[in-house]
């Protein structure tokens, strides 16, 4: 090949390569511009938050002798949509309850640095569960813990930790409160916090860390709320509040709250005579609560809340095996669904139950007179048949030789169904244990299971003789 032919050949090859490079550059430019201007927005229904999600484009140009360009494009992945919870899945079918969590707060307090608390409860956001309690403004190994048997002081605050984490000195104090309720609507936490004088208390409504609304005492007699989780459906949260006598007629109202703002208040209606300390759960499309009648009944009141039209219906759990303490023995006790049974109705304890078709699952103290022991069981026909007493699937949670206390329900949404869980307050100290001057608690938590399970007892477990006085 002569020199002229070599020059022509090299020129032809170079021109071909240059043309290919030019076409590749145009293709890369078109791709880059298309990706840059393409809209990436995580759209959602009108009630949901709109979260823009623009792609991040990073170009790395690596130049070779042949002028080829490699471009790497990294695209941001849109975050999950933040939506209101609607709790529309069915309730899980269960055979009983399995152990879930225990915080051992009193045993750990022997080493110091753990809050004095009472009125604990559990509630979950879409990803994690938390335990709450009303602190007494002191740790147990502190002389301020003396006389903490009292319910209402200006030093009490609502504490919040991940479930299973005892309330140590680094615990967040959510608000000032001697009565409270909390729930997550899918976007943020709502806390209802009651504090102030008995005759003129204030309930503060804190949403997403900000005070949004408040309401003052309407009957001037210890405004109080659930001491367990409230429930939110499609952005509307419901909380049951009572103001008035603890042993006669009181004034109960159901508040409807949207992002911390009170949007409606409904009076209690129906046949329930006295309603306090409700344990509520989502029963789509509404909310259902099982409460404490501190006046006339040892059978528990039921409050059904319609979130759409704000209507309220109330009655009583039909099961003749009643859930409150004190109560008559099971042979003598009764309940006929509509009215209080007038059996040892004065006084009581916070508790829970939930419907399962025509049946009812429930928990109660083993003792008929005191807050000792704890058991759960199912009553066939207990939700629909007056005075039904056929008990199955009984479990002992705390044996009768150990103390219990308040108990309540919380709900956890799974992939295909909504599970019901409960906690039991394990009270220690005064009045029963007079060696010490404080009153506090730990908790144990169980959740519904469709599997098999064994037996046991899960008391507080602290040796009172090893505890600070």
Curated annotation (Swiss-Prot):
Protein location: Virion membrane; Host apical cell membrane
- Specify where the region named Involved in apical transport and lipid raft association lies, as residue ranges: 11-33
Q: Which residues form the active site?
A: 151, 406
Q: Which GO BP terms sit in this record?
A: carbohydrate metabolic process; viral budding from plasma membrane
For this UniProt entry, the molecular function terms from Gene Ontology, in alphabetical order, are:
exo-alpha-sialidase activity; metal ion binding
The enzyme class is: hydrolase
Q: Which keywords does this Swiss-Prot/TrEMBL entry list?
A: Calcium, Disulfide bond, Glycoprotein, Glycosidase, Host cell membrane, Host membrane, Hydrolase, Membrane, Metal-binding, Signal-anchor, Transmembrane, Transmembrane helix, Virion
Q: Where is this region: Head of neuraminidase?
A: 91-469
| Entry's EC annotation | 3.2.1.18
Intravirion compartment spans: 1-9
What residues form the membrane-spanning segments? 10-30
The positions annotated for binding substrate are: 118, 152, 276-277, 292, 371
Question: Does this UniProt record's set of keywords contain Oxidoreductase?
Answer: no
- Disulfide connectivity for this sequence is 92-417, 124-129, 183-230, 232-237, 278-291, 280-289, 318-337, 421-447
Could you say how this protein's activity is regulated? Inhibited by the neuraminidase inhibitors zanamivir (Relenza) and oseltamivir (Tamiflu). These drugs interfere with the release of progeny virus from infected cells and are effective against all influenza strains. Resistance to neuraminidase inhibitors is quite rare.
Domain of life assignment:
Viruses
Q: What does this protein do?
A: Catalyzes the removal of terminal sialic acid residues from viral and cellular glycoconjugates. Cleaves off the terminal sialic acids on the glycosylated HA during virus budding to facilitate virus release. Additionally helps virus spread through the circulation by further removing sialic acids from the cell surface. These cleavages prevent self-aggregation and ensure the efficient spread of the progeny virus from cell to cell. Otherwise, infection would be limited to one round of replication.
Q: Which protein, by its recorded name, is this?
A: Neuraminidase
